[in-house]
Amino acid sequence: MYRRLGEALLLSRAGPAALGSAAADSAALLGWARGQPSAAPQPGLTPVARRHYSEAAADREDDPNFFKMVEGFFDRGASIVEDKLVEDLKTRESEEQKRNRVRGILRIIKPCNHVLSLSFPIRRDDGSWEVIEGYRAQHSQHRTPCKGGIRYSTDVSVDEVKALASLMTYKCAVVDVPFGGAKAGVKINPKNYTDNELEKITRRFTMELAKKGFIGPGIDVPAPDMSTGEREMSWIADTYASTIGHYDINAHACVTGKPISQGGIHGRISATGRGVFHGIENFINEASYMSILGMTPGFGDKTFVVQGFGNVGLHSMRYLHRFGAKCVGVGESDGSIWNPDGIDPKELEDFKLQHGSILGFPKAKVYEGSILEADCDILIPAASEKQLTKSNAPRVKAKIIAEGANGPTTPEADKIFLERNIMVIPDLYLNAGGVTVSYFEWLKNLNHVSYGRLTFKYERDSNYHLLMSVQESLERKFGKHGGTIPVVPTAEFQDRISGASEKDIVHSGLAYTMERSARQIMRTAMKYNLGLDLRTAAYVNAIEKVFKVYNEAGVTFT
């Protein structure tokens, strides 16, 4: 069953006062996006005059500064929410003092607090020496620890890690994960190094972070990112636990995305891709938004294209395929493939593992041109930043752009998509599945017990006794004893009757997190009359939450 904003499921969680009439909300949203005024203006739906906090951040080039890109999006959200933040302050101050306080805290939130730049030597297997460069940026400590991945790439720069760290702050706030934002990068191409050399680099980088106080269970917790995975996270955990964390019982909580044997959690590998799926699901099943786009709700008749067939792209493709959408194109750095009849994710994964590339896949042909401009309903950029620009945005044919990567859309492209009535589901919401499940893993490490272990047998026995109680009640009612009225669980209930596994709990928690956050974004978009500008709505939500922490904590040392 497809939803309209504000119906029973949402009302039961947020309360009727939080949302108002479902019909009125949907009508207001639909009217705004089509450029029609609402029949009767409602509270919160008045158009907002945006303040231009930073004109310099509005870079109009195809390759804008990444950090200024994020700052520009922040400024857009801040200009909208400032009046509400002033209004909500419950202090004995004048209007001017309140506004100064709000603007001051917004200036505190925006910059990157710490950036560590380091270099260290390694001896390679052939006996030569090389100096490795690396960075770690901590954007905000309004919540600790800081959280953010480590990527290995020759494109790593100070600007990139600062931008990604700031995105992590807002991302965590959007999905209510209590972390500050951080990011790290090591400037190497991992394909040019042996496994032994990569282990040396990873362990030495960990020690350099530890010496500077940039890693620890309560300080800064890295995670996998581009070209890193379980193996690298295991090396980091072992290095920290064997050295500076030797006496810390929580040492293995210094990093997430670890193998299960090292304190990892079931469902972490696929978490970001699964989060992308749930994020798309929440909007594609929303009848009001689909009506705006001229589409029918649900995945059944939808086609999609994935740019980037790494961890995020693969698992996004798997889940969309499983729920009825058809993948017609996949793009990688060395080329793209196309099949209008559909591409099976498992077959493509096996082919790439065997051949090292998607090119040559027998059930698809090579796609000439940019896969970003291919004909589809849903486009999932899941590669790197700044892929959708002012140059190619007018040629994008998809009606929904689901940002699986960080920062794939430049501000100018974002503006073009809004003008063309294309829905962009923003990165700071859509790819938050990874950090959400990383949070679950971190909690598991601090609790030193896996999810479900303490309740597994109790739940199974409770379900058994419930069924027996129902059966005995029916037998007493109809005077038949001895099991002549058996109560047989349905197949779906039978799957759950033995209790939830750790993976079940993780998947359920992730789905709920993405659903709740999507509802918050939808409500904010309606409240501020933003229509399809979901990115600004997400930034508004993030800014409100981070602002509240700073404001209530106080700013004594200023």
Swiss-Prot record:
Transit peptide, from-to: 1-53
Chain positions with Phosphoserine modification: S79, S128, S227, S384
Pfam family, one: ELFV_dehydrog
Residue numbers bearing the Phosphotyrosine modification: Y135, Y512
Signal sequence coordinates: none
Record PTM N6-(2-hydroxyisobutyryl)lysine, positions in chain: K147
Modification N6-malonyllysine occurs at: K457, K503, K527
Binding locations of GTP: H266, S270, Y319, R322
Subcellular location field: Mitochondrion; Endoplasmic reticulum
Gene Ontology terms, MF aspect: ATP binding; glutamate dehydrogenase (NAD+) activity; glutamate dehydrogenase (NADP+) activity; glutamate dehydrogenase [NAD(P)+] activity; GTP binding
Gene Ontology cellular-component annotations: endoplasmic reticulum; mitochondrial inner membrane; mitochondrial matrix; mitochondrion
Catalyzed reactions per annotation: L-glutamate + NAD(+) + H2O = 2-oxoglutarate + NH4(+) + NADH + H(+); L-glutamate + NADP(+) + H2O = 2-oxoglutarate + NH4(+) + NADPH + H(+)
Residues where N6-succinyllysine is found: 68, 84, 110, 162, 183, 191, 200, 346, 352, 363, 365, 390, 415, 457, 477, 480, 503, 527, 545
Positions annotated to bind substrate: K147, K171, S438
GO annotation terms (biological process): glutamine metabolic process; positive regulation of insulin secretion; tricarboxylic acid metabolic process
Processing and modification events after translation: Acetylation of Lys-84 is observed in liver mitochondria from fasted mice but not from fed mice.
Residue numbers carrying Phosphothreonine: T410
Gene3D superfamilies: 1.10.287.140, Leucine Dehydrogenase, chain A, domain 1, NAD(P)-binding Rossmann-like Domain
ADP-ribosylcysteine PTM positions: C172
Residues with PTM N6-acetyllysine: 84, 90, 110, 162, 171, 183, 187, 191, 211, 326, 346, 352, 363, 365, 386, 390, 399, 415, 457, 477, 480, 503, 527, 545, 548
Annotated NAD(+) binding sites: Q141, H142, R143, D176, H252, K444
Protein's UniProt keywords contain Repressor: no
Top EC group: oxidoreductase
Quaternary organization: Homohexamer. Interacts with HADH; this interaction inhibits the activation of GLUD1.
Homology family: Belongs to the Glu/Leu/Phe/Val dehydrogenases family.
Protein name: Glutamate dehydrogenase 1, mitochondrial
Lineage: Eukaryota, Metazoa, Chordata, Craniata, Vertebrata
